[in-house]
A protein has these predicted regions:
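Buried hydrophobic side chains on well-structured beta-strands
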Residues: 1-4, 91, 175
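Short loop or secondary-structure boundary microenvironments that flank
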Residues: 8, 100, 177-180
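A bilobed periplasmic-binding-protein/Venus flytrap-type ligand-binding module shared by bacterial periplasmic
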Residues: 74-77, 173-183
């Protein structure tokens, strides 16, 4: 078995839908998922590896890059239906949903467009992308969400992109594991599979 710590929304929206492929290839390996939203020490847990958004430089670990975090500004169709010609500056007049783990995300997004908005830090603050996504779907505000977490919501029309602009945040997603487990057969099989899945996903992006 493999004990894997993973940020919950990534697990639910990206990893779990693909995990059946790994189970088909390796039916004798069970992958146990535990929710982790903050950095931790492997020595304090029973985890073999983790998928984390942030810095890969954890002491005593090795890592495999998975993908960048490309944030898209989205909202519910009902919230934006009367504003069909939105420009980036117009978004400041709509409620902005904030992420407690990325408190300056909207400011960085606006600045990437050369804009400085007075109320860019205001708005309801939430910890997880899953919660923020649901709040946006229910019309409670605009959200900045990584595209790979909301592809189905965009496809089904539950969320709509507000303008054609993706902001690459300073966070990247990595597969991280203790260096002493580098030769672990189960971990190596999962790492190889995950790397292939992430590479396929990245190459399919426009």
């Amino acid at each position: 078995a493999l004990e894997l710590g993973v940020v919950p929304t990534f697990a639910a929206k990206w990893l779990v839908p693909r995990l059946g492929d790994f189970q088909r290839l390796h039916p004798d390996i069970a992958v146990h998922l535990s929710s982790r939203t903050r950095p931790f020490l492997f020595a304090d847990t029973a985890l073999d590896a983790a998928i984390f958004a942030g810095d890969a430089g954890w002491p005593g670990t090795a890592s495999c890059f998975l993908m960048d975090e490309r944030l898209v500004a989205v909202g519910s169709p009902a919230l934006v239906k009367t504003r069909r010609t939105l420009k980036a500056a117009d978004l400041a007049h709509l409620p902005l949903l904030q992420m407690s783990t990325r408190p300056y995300a909207w400011r960085q997004w606006f600045e990437s467009l050369g804009l400085h908005i007075d109320n860019d830090l205001a708005g309801a603050r939430m910890e997880l992308f899953s919660i923020t996504t649901e709040a946006a779907i229910h019309g409670q505000g605009l959200a900045l969400i990584p595209r790979f977490l909301i592809e189905e919501d965009l496809k089904q029309g539950r969320l709509v992109p507000l303008i054609e602009h993706e902001f690459v945040s300073d966070r990247r997603y990595y597969f991280i594991y203790p260096e002493q487990k580098s030769d672990n057969t189960v971990l190596a099989l999962f790492r190889s599979w995950l790397d292939a899945q992430a590479t396929r996903y990245r190459e399919a992006q426009p």
